Amino acid sequence: MQDEPTPTELTKAVADFLRNEITPDIKGHNAFKLRVAINMLDLVTRQLTLEHASDATEAARLSQLLGLQGLDHRGSLADLNRALADGIADGKLDLQTPGLQAHLWQTTMDKLAVDQPNYASYKRELEQE
């Protein structure tokens, strides 16, 4: 595996090149399709930059909520979320469960940071934190 450039640097460089060098010359529907492609590259860049850390903190919060901290559990993040959903469906967990509401809120904010960082409501919430 090569150290430089990183996948994040590569996707950002391609997006910047398309945005700054190619977009001005493209018109009509192709300009729209190009903007969609650039947005997808920006999304991948954010995923590469932010997702690992947010997944790790989400898994830690889920482990605590599910009473698994300190245990040797090898479940994936999807497994932990499935266990959370099952706990909610079974009535074992609800919004009165300490930490659940904060976990759901933080998970939503972390996902918006990757998927929709320019979403007006997300930006407003960041200003209030």
Residue ranges of predicted features:
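Short, charged early-sequence alpha-helical segments and their helix-coil boundaries
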Residues: 47-63
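N-terminal interaction modules that seed assembly of large macromolecular complexes
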Residues: 15-48
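C-terminal amphipathic alpha-helical interaction region
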Residues: 8-16, 30, 59-129
